[in-house]
Regions:
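Short glycine-rich anion-binding loops that position phosphate/pyrophosphate groups of nucleotides
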Residues: 1, 18, 171-175
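Active-site gating loop/helix substructures
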Residues: 114-170, 174
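Charged helix-capping and loop-helix junction motifs
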Residues: 180-187
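A short, Lys/Arg-enriched amphipathic alpha-helix followed by its capping loop at the start of a domain
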Residues: 3-14
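Electropositive, gly/pro-rich neighborhoods at or near active sites that engage anionic ligands
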Residues: 22-139
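Short internal beta-strands
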Residues: 15-20, 188
């Protein structure tokens, strides 16, 4: 989605990106576990792609620490988003605040404020828990679903209803695209 948005921001359109928040690997997974927050990695990528700031800011937000401390592997942008969510009280407000600082050309919305867990039922009947385990599974996926039904953000429903055009972006069908579409509130 971030590559598409990087190009779309050059056109005279109002962009609203709805971002799946089920990533649970690497820096995002650790932050989700520690702060019980929605995934921030994909949100960071979308924010960077819509940002109207210097290339150095993009490099900073995507920078991952390489150290032997607990910061190892964390992306600066993921830490900033998590901090903003803590400061403002929720992820949506944290994204909005950081978006103003970074002069975004568009709006970024998390699908949900919930710390969701994506599940997959494989064709062989096994159940796989967690987005990064699903992408690493060697079996064919039959269906994906959430461990607990998420509450879709009201702003997401409003944005979908008011949209002139809805574009489904490139990405993994089962771990990036379908997680937004398996929510009944989104489909309605």
């Amino acid at each position: 989605i971030s590559y598409l948005l990087k190009s779309l921001k050059d056109f005279p359109v109002d962009i609203t990106a709805v971002v799946s928040v089920c990533d649970d690997g690497s820096s995002t997974g650790r932050l989700r576990e520690e702060f019980n927050t929605p995934a921030v990695g994909d949100i960071r990528k979308v924010i960077v792609s819509l940002s109207e700031t210097e290339p150095l800011v993009e490099e900073l937000l995507n920078y991952r620490f390489k150290t032997t401390s607990d910061l190892n592997g964390h992306a600066v942008g993921n830490l900033l988003l998590t901090a903003m969510a803590n400061i403002t009280g929720n992820m949506s407000d944290g994204i909005e605040s950081l978006s103003k600082v970074l002069n975004l050309k568009g709006k970024v919305l998390p699908l949900t404020e919930d710390n969701v867990v994506l599940m997959a039922k494989m064709h062989d009947g096994t159940i796989v828990e967690g987005e990064h385990h699903i992408t690493e599974a060697h079996s064919k996926i039959k269906e994906v679903y959430y461990k607990h039904k998420p509450i879709v953000c009201d702003a997401v429903i409003k944005a979908i209803r008011e949209a002139d055009c809805i574009i489904l972006s490139m990405g993994s069908l089962f771990t990036s695209i379908l997680p937004n579409l398996i929510c009944k509130d989104v489909i309605k």
